[in-house]
Each structure stands twice: as C-alpha cells, then as structure tokens.
Amino acid sequence: MKFVNLIRAHLFLILLASGLVSAGEKTSSIVFTGTENAVVVNQHSNSVSYLNLGETVEKVGEISVGLSPQTVAYDADRQLVWVTNQGENSVSILSSTSPRRFGVIKTKAAPYGVIISNKFAFVSSQHSNLIQVFDKYNYVLIAEIRVEDKPRGLTLTSDEKWLYTTHFDSGKISKIDAQRFEIIETISLGNRAGLTQSISIDQNEKFAYIPNTIRNTDSTSLEFDTSVFPFVSIVDLENRKHLRSQRIALDIIDEPVGLPLSSRLVGDNLFVLNAASNDISVVDIKLNLLSAHIEVGSFPVGIVQGPDQRYLYVDNSIDGSVSVIEASTLVEIDRQPVTQIPLDNDTREGIRLFHTSNDTRMAKDQWISCATCHFNGGSDNLVWNFPDGLRSTPSLIASSHTGPFHWSGNLDELHDVEDTIRDLQGGTGLIDGPANCVPTCDSAEKNEGRSEALDNLAKYITSLKFDATATNTANTQDTELSKQRGARLFRSFEFSCSACHAAPLYTDNENHIVNLAEGGKATINTPSLLELARSSPYYHDGRFKTLHELLDRHPADIEGQSQVNLEGDSVADLVSFLESISRPAFLSLPALLTSTEAPVSQSPLNGISRVSLELVVNKESPHALEISYTHSGNSAFDTFLIVEHLATAAYWYFENNSTIKKFRLGADIMPMSIHQISEGVHRHEMPNILLDNLDLAGEIFTFHAIATERGASPYDALNWLFYDVKEIEL
C-alpha cells in the first residue's frame, strides 16, 4: 500500500485521539470551581481571591501570583486553576479549593487568555502573536499557533473542535482548528474596530458577539462623541462572515457607555461590561433591544453565572470588588471588596481617574476615558487628526522621564493633560479655574499643586513602568551577531544615531525641525526608542509602517541632516538592534515570582505529538533543499521523515537529520530524531540537503513527517501520534 493510501485510511484515528468531552468555555477573570466556590483575579493586587458566592460575596482566602494577572481557568479534572501573569510571561498553577501554589509555567510574551479543554490548556501570548498549547497533565508545550497581532480573548466551542481568539488592536477574530492546532481564517470586524477582548457564542454556536470600540480616525474635528463609538459586532460562524448591518450600537439602544470589553451570553440576554463607564448593558439579542442597564463597580472586566443560574457575578477590577446581579430582576443586589489593592490612596485614585468615563470631570456623557486610547498606559497604535496635524498615539509608559510631552513638546508637565481632558474628553476638568494653557501650555503657569485630583492622576501616570520581562524572541547565534553589528552602526561616528537617541532613555528630549510628508515643516520632540518593536506605526504622523521604511528616509528628513548609506544587511542589522534595545532597570517593574519551579507533572491521558515541516529549494542550487521541522511530544517519541516519488514508487528516509537513504516499503527504517522523554516545541534545521544523487530534477516529491511513540513502527497508522505532508518540485 502506498503511503498516501495508508494516510487516507487511518488519519481519522489521530483526530479521534484529541477527545471531545467538556463544554464550551471562554476566558474570564472570574470562574466557578464548585457549586458555591469561585476564584477571581485581582489585576492590581497581583493576587487571586477565593470566594464563597451566593446572594452575597464572602472572601475565604487570597494568594499572591505574578505581575499583572489577567484571567483564570478551572481544570475540573485536576482541581486546579491556571492564572496568566501578563507582566512576567508565566502562568501560575494553583489549587482550586484553597490558596495553595503548585508551580509556574513559563510562556511567551504577555500571556492574557487561558482556557482549559479535556486535555489541553490554551494560552494567548499577546506580544508574541501566538496561541500556546500545553498538555494540562504534564505541562509540556505541545504546539505554538502563529496568529495575527495581539491575540487576547479565547472561546472554545462545546465540542472542543474550534477555538476563537480576538485580536485586541485590529478588531479581528481568528478561527483555529483546536484539534490540529491550525488557523483556519481571520475575520475582520472593520478597519476601525478595536479593543476586542471577548467573544460570546450563542447556544447553537452559529453566531458570535464581540464587544468593541469603533475608532473614527478619519475625523478631522476630534470631539468626545465623534472619535469613538461603543458597539457589539456579530459574526456568522458557519459562513465566517461579519454581519456589519446587524451590529449593535450601544450608545443608541442604551445610554452613552464607555469601553465595552467583556461579555457573557445568558439565554437571549447578552451582558456587556462597559469598563470605563462602570456599567452593564443587558441586550436582548433576538429583539436587539435593551433589557436592562446595571451600574456596578469600577472598571468591570469579568462576569460569570453561578451554577444555579440565579445570580451573575462581576469582577470590578479597579476597586477590587465583586458585584452580585440577580438574574430574575437584573439588579445589583450586593457588592463586596475581595482584595485590598496595595497602593497608596493617591495612586489608587489616579488609577480610577485614568480609567473612568463615569466622572463628569473626566468625560462628558460617559463617552471616553484616558484608557480608551492608552489602554494599560500604552498606545492604541493609531494615527489621529489633531489640530496640529496627523499624530500617532504615544505610549505613556515611562513617559514621565522623557518630557516635554506631546509630539510637539508643548506640554512641560504631566499636569497639562488637564487641557486634553477638557478639549478632547469633554470633561469639566480636575482644576477649578483655567487649564493654564493660554497662549500655550508650556508658557503658562504650572498646574502642579492646583488640584489634588490632578496631582493624583499625574502620580499614576508617573508610576507607569514596563513589565518585569522583555518581549522574548528566539535568540540564535545569527540574530545575536546581527544585533551586535546593528549596535556598532547605531553608535558609529558615521551614523551618529546616539547623538539624538542616547542611552538609557534613547532620546535627547529636545525638539527638532522635521520635514512633513505633506510639505512644510514642524517642530517635533525626539521620541524614545524603548520598546520600539511594539510602537508601530513610526514617526509623529505614523507615515512609516515598518522600521525598514523609516530607515530608508531617516535622518534626511531632519533639518540639517543628510541621508546615510545603508548597504547590504546593514538595515536588517540596525533594525535587529533597535527592536532589542534593553529597558533600564529603573523603568521596569520588579518580578514578583521569586521561584519559577514547574509544577509536578502527571502522566498524560495518552501520547500526543505534533510535527510540522517547512521545505525551501535553494535558489543557488536547485537540487539542494532547506528542510526544517518543528516537533513536540508529551511522552517519549520518534520522528520519521520519508520522501516519496509517486511516479516511480521510490522511497527514501532521513536518518540523524542529515543522511538520506533509499528503502523499500516494509524494510526497517531509522527515525530522523529520537526523544527518550517528553519534549516541548523545538525546531530543527537541515540546510543544503543535496539530492543530486536522485537524478529526478523537475519531478514532484512528497515529504511525509510522522511522529510515533518511542520505538513504534511508522508502518502502522495506529502508532501515529501526528502526521504532516508537503509536496515540492525540484
């Protein structure tokens, strides 16, 4: 039997091994772990609280976790909870019954969502653009699914066949095959949609409801009620289509609300948590009408329904409380604190002011907050039409060290945000009296000390620092050498980049005259180069989408500067360095997890492996292949690579990653690689594999990659843990 027929006869057995048991789940910051027991993530306390929930809230325990915990998932099979620590690139594994810590799993950069299936834990890595898949029994990393930018919220269908993820900035959702760990399609909610964090799926799993904010970046007259709009978008999951004409405008069916982030569907009622306006819009999805408007605590981000379905519980993240909503009356009947946020009163008040639109001093009609454009103190990575021209949104993290502020450098103190609060957000302001920005903010009297509330807001912005861990990248010898070459170019006399971008902040905090893309000139303050990889688009007006584009024009667009000649790999080397610039320690938060010991593993339910092939013909040598493969396994496994030529029924196999040998079907063959123990995702590269001896140029070859349990025969498809196939013409 040819290998192709063997594959068709037995491939379904591999899919059955994934198991389809548990009910559908979605990411949340609060989950039930029993009939009355629940755990909630305390984002600003860096902890998790254990609760007894009924018609009131009783806190029974609390345990510290890593920096900036975000969501929690319950593993009923093992009585554990998984908590993502976004600020430390890790997941804490805790007991679900009492405050006990079992260990920590390291992840890629900025994990946000976590969801547990029958066998796996799925974790979204927001800054690495990956969905990581772990065996939930022995914690081995089984797969990494490459997706578009900033994956965040996760939802798993009840049959565990499909996984959906939101993309926070771009207003997209991706559909993923949760058995083969492959992306199927990415669906856009429109190029203005963003801040997409949650997906709720109806009971028939035909439609998805995604809260989001439409950002009107085309507006040339920015006002509080023309810049952003709160919506719920609807996606037809069967046809993978955004139903644009059916989307729900929350400001029309409800009163104006701010920053709809999370949601939960209960029957026909969709509970939409409007984080900035501190309320819930309950929408009847059949009638497209408002069922109720519920006021809750500060910045609600998570909601869960109790097992008896009598109550819903809301995580109010900024005031560290949980609200109880009676399902029959849709009324908040209780709200209790579940943590004491370990910050001084002034900073806590600053956090509240920064995130709220439910304060007439900060916003008009609950429409917009500082966090709408600067979520978590960062940037929305958009370009807006301000009176002085197109301006990309800068991050506020560590900004207190890089004044003056704004691209034009026209704010000489953080307290001058009073002008933005009044002019853009429509608030009455935090100061009694003028904003002291006439004729300009930097020429008027100081605002510091004029308002306790404004001082508190400025204190919070000043406290913003980078996470404890940098964005992790694969550091090979080649990439390290490229960074070193780029660093030498950056500091060289010829290029003199460091003249304006000196370490450790990589800015001179000075204004320079820049030639504008539309003609004319403008005075622009030198931006810091810290975290440059995550701050696209580049320049004050966002004219450059990539650093490669920027380096093609810069610094010749600075008055008095001439263009430098970057040849060969110099641009790539300089970009490699720019994207790897280290943040100074005083601008980074300290890690909280002093021990990152992995939890004690259990034997997995059954052997699972994954293997993925990449084949590239060397352009300079048509008979030379660049072969790479990525594989993993939760137990000991072998990986075979077999080459098939259908026209002649000839077969070859690879031995030890380099040697290729011809064989007849049925003969003993050696694995390409052997793993005596479980092994997480790792990559092998076999450059310049010469196939001249095959003498079959122009023919099509089929490459079969097969993973089996250690020592098992690759001829029996029942032994296959995974299979991948690629065709290539030499």
PLM feature spans:
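Short beta-strand elements
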Residues: 713-730
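Residue-level detector of Asp-centered blade-edge/turn motifs that repeat once per structural unit
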Residues: 32-35, 75-78, 116-118, 158-159, ...
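A short beta-strand motif characteristic of beta-propeller blades
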Residues: 58-63, 100-105, 140-145, 182-188, ...
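Short loop/turn segments that connect beta-strands within beta-propeller blades
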Residues: 52-56, 95-99, 135-139, 177-181, ...
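Periplasmic c-type cytochrome electron-transfer domains
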Residues: 23, 169, 179, 194-222, ...
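Beta-strand-rich domains and repeat architectures in extracellular enzymes and scaffolds
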Residues: 23-46, 258-261
